[in-house]
Amino acid sequence: MKKYKIIMTGGGSAGHVTPNLALVPKLKELGFEIKYIGSKNGIEKEIITKENIPYYSISSGKLRRYFDIKNFTDPFKVLKGVMDASRILSKEKPDVIFSKGGFVTVPVVIAASMKKIPVVSHESDLTPGLANKIASPFCDTLCVTFPESLKYIKDNKGELTGTPIREDLLKGDKERGRKFCNFKENKKVLMIIGGSLGSKVINESVRKILNEILKEYNVIHLCGKGNLDESLKNLDGYRQYEYISEELPDLMALADLVISRAGANTIFELLALRKLNILIPLSANASRGDQVLNANSFEKSGYSMVIKEEELNSELLLKSIKDLEKNREKYLNSMKMSKIGNGVNNIIDIIKKSAHM
């Protein structure tokens, strides 16, 4: 019986890595041998090696929409990355590549195309990111999360699959989460998720009104690397963490209300878990505007309350928390009516088909 092999790739932020992990249990169940290609120093290396998945590093350059002196040197890094990836693919001879986006994926997808290895990519956001845009001519299928995304995909390569959500995230234990946080008072729990890199503006707005928030809530604050505030370390009812992985399902189960960036993976997880949420998308000035589009789509569907980053201040945030609580049932009912499910099985079917399984 043939042993099938898949190489997964994706990196730069946790959002380009964790959806890969959602597919791993099912792939293993089907008998796939799994390897991973990422960058030398990206967050993906730490996340993937923890899962005991063999990891290859390649050179990768960032691709930018704006002028930067590195725009002259980074294409050479991408070229070296294609050569690195090509050597790995020649050695491993995978049946299929699964790419989750991020700049490290571009050399892998190009090398795979040159070697006639089928490539399945996934785009979480409403509009394709720059890496997926560049890589899409070399892909066989581009899976998307939002129905609106299909119009951006050329050559009929688009497939509406939804986003893959880790099964363990849907099976968190509330009491285990409470024990982990060691909250003394039995209040509601407010969780703040600033993304794997953190958000200075969200962190500051929350911390300014902490005393007010703590009257009603215990607070779990995922503030990003290097953003812990030592002066708040011993504050009752407030727990701050740079990044949480293993305990995240339990903390999500514990949360009654979530304030979050609007990365597609996170918002679809909040929808699947039916969590009341306030989205503060990364502004179009600081990004390509993908989070703004994601948040607008969720606001329109009645799943989320949205605050523009440009308008964010502590007073507005406090008012929004109170307004969300007042309208709790309206938002929860909209989420319950959603027909958007976990994309794992849809994506696995496409991977199997591409690998001729």
UniProtKB/Swiss-Prot annotation:
Ordered alphabetically, the record's keywords are:
Cell cycle, Cell division, Cell membrane, Cell shape, Cell wall biogenesis/degradation, Glycosyltransferase, Membrane, Peptidoglycan synthesis, Transferase
What SUPFAM superfamilies is this protein classified in? UDP-Glycosyltransferase/glycogen phosphorylase
Q: What class of enzyme is it?
A: transferase
The record lists UDP-N-acetyl-alpha-D-glucosamine as bound by S13, A14, G15, R166, S196, Q291
* Gene Ontology biological-process annotations: carbohydrate metabolic process; cell division; cell wall organization; lipid glycosylation; peptidoglycan biosynthetic process; regulation of cell shape
Q: Which reaction is catalysed here?
A: di-trans,octa-cis-undecaprenyl diphospho-N-acetyl-alpha-D-muramoyl-L-alanyl-D-glutamyl-meso-2,6-diaminopimeloyl-D-alanyl-D-alanine + UDP-N-acetyl-alpha-D-glucosamine = di-trans,octa-cis-undecaprenyl diphospho-[N-acetyl-alpha-D-glucosaminyl-(1->4)]-N-acetyl-alpha-D-muramoyl-L-alanyl-D-glutamyl-meso-2,6-diaminopimeloyl-D-alanyl-D-alanine + UDP + H(+)
- State the pathway, as annotated in the record: Cell wall biogenesis; peptidoglycan biosynthesis
Give the chief site where it resides.
Answer: membrane
One of this protein's Pfam families, by short name? Glyco_tran_28_C
UniProt GO cellular component terms: plasma membrane
In the record, the note on similarity to other proteins reads: Belongs to the glycosyltransferase 28 family. MurG subfamily.
Protein known as: UDP-N-acetylglucosamine--N-acetylmuramyl-(pentapeptide) pyrophosphoryl-undecaprenol N-acetylglucosamine transferase
What organism is recorded for this protein?
Clostridium perfringens (strain 13 / Type A)
Upper lineage? Bacteria, Bacillati, Bacillota, Clostridia, Eubacteriales
